[in-house]
């Protein structure tokens, strides 16, 4: 497994320590965001660190293509889809791995994140329980050498993966070299664990924490399962900025298990399962989310997940409030061996209302009706979705 040795022979990586007191619980509304316009003073320390490092990597030419001022338009209609022209991604992105099962095991012979260049790493993030001190966020010189190990250590903690011990709270932040939007990164646990693309509680918890670390209402996090257009079978989340409001942030929902904030998104083209949290119960929310995704994996049901600032669905009305976050899970038809024939692939972004379009012709002609038709073709049949909803409610109510 020589490839593993080539990756990061004692690479030095910046460490970003964060604390619970860094979480931004009073979220910025989109109205307030628009008032700031180009003024970035509202950004949190996390936003500033991530954006500056990402732009630095872009200026160094580490991406497959430059991403500047993505051509964007809002489609007329009730959903207000955000369509963006991204021709270079469809041309230059890495060929996706062959996927045939949601439960597919990690294959070290396929491309995986043990093979990335050390320069692609932004920093590693560690949640600290220590007392917050001035300038304690970034610490230079943490060594990440376990990623260069000669074998996968799935199921065990790798020795030396971080000099300061890469515990479950240590997450690597890596640029997506084929970016969808500004600040597009991948969040992953220690790659030498060689975990397949099946969501874990620790990574889900980190994904929600990262949204609370950001003061930008447009910072999003997401997950594509195998069969849900995940292109690499190596555990990771996506994180990126989309500086446009999405309907999914405030769309109406129907309570399924109100006692655990589990809802069904309604009045939206892609019905999905919704969890809401104000940030006070992140660990238990991560457990419930993974109870759903584990159920889907066991049934070999492909799925996508989207994390965003959003309003509390319990209020029963549309609100500008963005103090909490919504986590939406879509069960869908699998894309095993599917050919990419539509204007866009239906994955986490598209289901949420963000459409990276592959070519100029489709970008010009695309309409809300055509988008909804493509999305509906990827969803479960109504009777199958109804039965799944009943099964999940029963499953979640089990102790």
UniProtKB/Swiss-Prot annotation:
This protein's UniProt keywords: Cytoplasm, Guanine-nucleotide releasing factor, Hydrolase, Nucleotide-binding, Nucleotidyltransferase, Transferase
GO CC annotations on file: cytoplasm
EC supergroup of this enzyme: transferase
Gene Ontology biological process terms, A to Z: glucose metabolic process
Catalytic site: 236
EC code(s) of this entry: 2.7.7.78
Primary site of residence: cytoplasm
UniProt superkingdom: Eukaryota
InterPro entries documented for this protein: GDPGP (IPR026506)
Localization of this protein: Cytoplasm
MF (Gene Ontology): GDP-D-glucose phosphorylase activity; guanyl-nucleotide exchange factor activity; hydrolase activity; nucleotide binding
Catalytic activity: GDP-alpha-D-glucose + phosphate = alpha-D-glucose 1-phosphate + GDP + H(+)
Role: Specific and highly efficient GDP-D-glucose phosphorylase regulating the levels of GDP-D-glucose in cells.
UniProt similarity note: Belongs to the GDPGP1 family.
Protein name: GDP-D-glucose phosphorylase 1
Organism: Xenopus tropicalis (Western clawed frog)
């Amino acid at each position: 497994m020589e490839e593993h040795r080539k990756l990061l022979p004692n690479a030095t990586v910046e460490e970003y320590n964060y604390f619970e007191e860094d979480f931004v619980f009073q979220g910025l509304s989109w109205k307030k965001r628009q008032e700031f316009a180009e003024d970035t003073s509202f950004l949190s320390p996390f936003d500033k660190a991530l954006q500056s490092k990402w732009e630095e990597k872009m200026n160094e030419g580490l991406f497959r293509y430059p991403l500047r001022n993505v051509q964007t338009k809002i489609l007329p209609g009730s959903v207000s889809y955000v369509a963006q022209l991204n021709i270079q991604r469809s041309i230059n992105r890495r060929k996706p791995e062959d996927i045939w099962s949601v439960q597919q095991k990690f294959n070290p012979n396929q491309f995986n994140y043990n093979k990335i260049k050390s320069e692609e790493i932004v920093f590693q993030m560690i949640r600290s329980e220590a007392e917050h001190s001035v300038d304690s966020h970034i610490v230079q010189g943490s060594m990440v050498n376990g990623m260069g190990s000669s074998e996968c250590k799935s199921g065990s903690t790798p020795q030396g993966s971080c000099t300061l011990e890469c515990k479950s709270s240590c997450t690597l932040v890596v640029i997506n070299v084929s970016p969808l939007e500004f600040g597009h990164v991948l969040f992953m646990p220690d790659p030498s664990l060689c975990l397949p693309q099946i969501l874990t509680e620790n990574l889900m918890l980190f994904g929600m924490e990262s949204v609370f670390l950001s003061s930008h209402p447009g910072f999003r996090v997401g997950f594509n399962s195998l069969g849900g257009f995940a292109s690499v079978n190596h555990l990771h989340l996506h994180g990126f900025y989309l500086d446009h409001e999405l309907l999914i942030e405030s769309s109406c929902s129907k309570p399924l298990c109100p006692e655990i904030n589990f809802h069904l998104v309604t009045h939206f083209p892609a019905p999905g399962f919704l969890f809401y949290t104000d940030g006070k119960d992140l660990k238990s929310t991560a457990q419930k989310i993974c109870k759903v995704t584990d159920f889907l994996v066991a049934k070999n049901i492909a799925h996508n997940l989207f994390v965003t600032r959003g309003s509390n669905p319990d209020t029963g009305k549309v609100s500008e409030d963005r103090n909490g976050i919504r986590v939406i899970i879509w069960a869908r038809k699998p894309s095993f061996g599917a050919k990419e024939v539509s204007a866009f692939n239906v994955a986490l972004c598209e289901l949420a209302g963000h459409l990276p379009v592959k070519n100029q012709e489709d970008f010009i002609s695309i309409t809300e009706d055509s988008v909804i038709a493509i999305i509906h073709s990827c969803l479960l049949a109504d009777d199958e979705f109804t039965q799944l909803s009943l099964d999940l409610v029963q499953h979640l109510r089990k102790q």
